[in-house]
Structure formats: structure tokens, C-alpha cells
Amino acid sequence: MKLGIIGAGAVGFAVGYTAARMGIASDIKYNDIIEERAKAQAMDIEDASSFYPHYVKMSWGSYKDMADRDIIVTATGSLDGVRDRLEEYEMFKDATEAYVKEIVAAGFKGIFIVVGNPCDLMADLVYRASGFPKERVIGSGTALDTTRLNTTLCKLLEIDPSDVRGVVLGEHGESQFVAWSNIFVNNLQLDEYLKQNPASFSRDDVENLVRERAWRVIDGKGHTQCGIGNTVCSMIDAIVKDRKKVILVATLMEGMYDLNDIYLSTPCVLGKNGMEKAIELKLTDEELERLKHSEKVLKANREKYK
């Protein structure tokens, strides 16, 4: 599989290195506005070739050179000095729209995975700029937030993370929320599990911990990396290996939850054709209202910077 990565910063590097370590790409090409950084990241990953499952061809190139890629990950942007991902939209929307159009004009026929923040609005932008069907433009959405939730709950409940099936919906940002009615632990709905295995914790505190986790990491080391790198590569793996795996990603709302014309996160089946099926969960009235609030926040910001 030929993988293209736009943006060779911390996140772009993490995606490329993880893809090489997992053996899900045979050819990885970087692009960055700083060409020397793209070259350096490619060479650094190539230097570990002896430790990968198979040889991975590493290179760097222009937007036009991305035309032959099977999957392109857009990892552009920066959270330096920013405390709300939505602030990045005005900063990077024009550049993103321009390079997407250039890549598509060069003949790209694959799948876009949009990671750069604000990833919901950027996925919406890539969808419109590319002219691709929604199945071939996927936002990383709340996939990472959901793994953060699972990790938080597994520590509170003292169980393995794989035994928790959490759900974070809405925007990948300040208006995201935990859909508590859809959390399962060892195949039991959370409330039922807690009746049998009592544990005391504040749900509001859990939501805040999940929402603020990225900022705590950024404050400490300047960027997030490992979580998002593995999250995106789980999406790539599901597509490349046609796993039909359900992952919380951002997709175009076309009537689900009575929402329309915006990218938001919901469980989606990922396979060889990209986003193959979006799943509408049964939510409480409060959860539906919070999801609609996310829609309003994103649409307001899209309109603001039109």
C-alpha cells in the first residue's frame, strides 16, 4: 500500500513510523512546507528498516507526487499557542483547500484521512474541495478521544482497556461528550456493570479528563504523538485489510440524528472502500441535544470563516 502524509511534524511522523512498524504500508511519501523536515522524517524512519516486518520505501515529494498514493493522511496544522482547535480553521483552511485541489487535479483516486485540526471542519473542507464521495474522506474525529475514555475507565474500574467499549460523540474538541448510555464493560451496559461491580467516580470529571487530556500532553511535551499515530494507523489497517472494523470517526451527516451537511463523529465501519457504513446510535434526549450543540458550534465556525 502506498501511503502519503501531508505534514511532517510530530503527528505526521508518528503516523509514518507507526505504519512502518505495523507493516501496513510498503511505500511512504512525505510532503511538508519545510522540505528538509520531510526529508529528515523519511530518512529517520528508513534508518529503522531492519526492525520492520518488511522493507518500506521512504521518500518525499510535491503535492503532485502524491497522485499515486492509495491513502493520503493530512496532518497539517499546529496547536502552538492555541487552546481551541477551532481557531486553527481560519489559519489553515485556504492552504488545505489549495493543496487538496492540486492533489486531486494530479490524478489522486484514493482515500483521504483528515487528522489536522479542527479535524471535523477540515474533513468537511477536504470533502468539498476534492469532490470525492463521503466514503473516501474520513476525519479522525473522536477515535482518539474514545481510546482516552476507554483508558480512563479501565483505570477507574481496574480492568483491561479492551474490555471497555466507550463512545465519545460530536466534535473533536470542546463540545465533544461521552455517550454514557452506550458504554459497555465486559458486554454489560455500564450502569448494569456497576450494579454488579460497584465503583465510585464522577462522570463529569471523566469527561473533563478526556477533553483536557490533549492539552495536558501538549503542555508537558509540546505535542501529541503516540495516541494519534496509533489511532490513525488503526484506521489505515482497517481499510487496507478490509477488516470491516467499527471505529468512531468523523463522517458527513445526511439525516442521522436529524443532522445534515456537517462532519461529526459516529461509529463507522471501515473497509477497503473507506467509510462503508455509518451507525446511528440510540441516544438519550440529553445526548441528542449535546450532539446538536456540536453541530451548531461547527456550522457557526464554518460560516464565520467562509
Residue ranges, per PLM feature:
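Short, well-ordered alpha-helices that flank and scaffold nucleotide-derived cofactor binding pockets
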Residues: 17-21, 43, 47, 101, ...
